[in-house]
């Protein structure tokens, strides 16, 4: 019976819902964008109630900084930025469009969305990739966290490539944000903006495939850095940066070798599966 799994899953969700969503009900008790997106989707499935989800998205909108970035957790006592986490806020809005279709609610957030995407655009390097926008937690201005996985313990969840330069995952997340934002803009009747976002996403796809792959076409953790992760293969597939046929080969390779390839954590497993 799946009943015990259902019970513990629902109980976990409830424990992480107070005046905000929380990454954990005991320790940090912070509303993180990546964590909250998964919790919101679960909430939609079990209740159809979007009140706390709306508040969550409004919270992150209010955390917008002068450069367009959002806090990765909010409410929060001070600046706390993971650039890639701003994309999960865009995904929340796309999810809300798919489940509820509330145009008025979405319109309120579009200025914030454009600010996020402009931040990434301004930080493209000469190759057309998202440049080095962050680094290690507590040492650099922003934290290029991707996932808590064993291979990245020493860099606090950042691919080692981030020690030397840009990381591929931030370019893939930016592409994902552009594609989902384009869908929302088109739904709101802003077709020219949607077209612009898709053109930018296509340019990014070409840059990633030119500079962030090895001789076989598998995605590297950073341009010229011979380290690999499941994460890059997953997000290359999710963004149609790689063909389904090749993407399957690369992903299966990571599934069969958990030593060579950094593995997705439970939290990132949603995107893997």
Where are these regions (language model features)?
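Active-site core of glycosidic bond-cleaving carbohydrate-active enzymes
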Residues: 31-47, 51-273
